[in-house]
A protein has these predicted regions:
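Active-site proximal beta-strand in glycosyltransferases
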Residues: 3, 87, 102-124, 147
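N-terminal strand-loop element at the rim of the active site
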Residues: 4-11, 23-68, 167
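Histidine-centered beta-alpha loop that forms part of the nucleotide-sugar donor binding/catalytic region
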Residues: 8, 118-121, 171-172
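Alpha-helix capping/helix-boundary segments
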Residues: 40, 95, 152-154
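An amphipathic, basic-hydrophobic alpha-helix
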Residues: 61-87, 97-102, 130-134, 138
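Nucleotide-sugar donor phosphate/pyrophosphate-binding loop at the beta->alpha transition
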Residues: 108-115, 121-141, 155
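A short beta-strand/loop micro-motif in the catalytic core of glycosyltransferases
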Residues: 141-150
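Helix-loop-beta element that forms the nucleotide-linked donor phosphate-binding surface
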Residues: 154-172
Length: 172
């Protein structure tokens, strides 16, 4: 398979899990494309079928904050089309799952699938911000597959967002 993985590249659980998963998938023969604003810190040595695609964010005087989510969606489109990805696996609902949803709607490859892995604060803290609630719910429901790293997180997601979609548990 050709798999695009998006994660936060910084120190922390979700970035570690995503990077180690990508490395294992590459060792097993899959082609893995990391799409992020910086190289994941755990991606320290060369593995033949791992590629990195940097998301550039531009600043524009009219807007106070850079458009990371939109820049990410654009880069996901570019990589998905050029590399003919089968799957975008995103770690974190906000903003990664929203960006993946946009990319999936834009690309010409209608077979592209999106899997979202929920890690914790994207659901229990950030996602509970009232302005993000509808986005989190929508991005989860629009994903082709959803995983959570614990039963607790799965239950929180189902009750906080009234999700009807199946959420698989893959402990980290």
């Amino acid at each position: 398979m050709k798999i695009g993985i998006t994660c936060y590249p910084t120190y922390g659980g979700s970035g570690v899990i995503a990077t180690e998963l990508g490395k294992e998938l590459a060792i097993r023969g899959h082609e893995v494309h990391f799409i992020s604003y910086a190289l994941p810190f755990r991606l320290t040595k060369y593995i033949e079928n791992i590629f990195f695609h940097e998301v550039d964010t531009t600043s524009y005087p009219l807007f106070e904050f850079p458009f990371y989510a939109l820049s990410l969606a654009s880069k996901m489109c570019e990589v998905a089309e050029f590399e003919k990805l089968d799957l975008l696996h995103v770690h974190y609902a906000i903003p990664h799952a929203i960006s993946a949803y946009l990319a999936k709607q834009i690309v010409k490859n209608k077979k592209l699938k999106v899997t979202t892995t929920l890690h914790g604060t994207d659901i229990t803290l950030v996602g509970l911000e009232p302005s993000f609630l509808p986005l989190v719910k929508f991005s989860i429901e629009q994903s082709d597959g959803v995983t959570a790293v614990s039963r607790f997180l799965k239950e929180k997601t189902l009750t906080n967002y009234y999700i009807e979609k199946e959420i698989d548990i893959i402990p980290n």
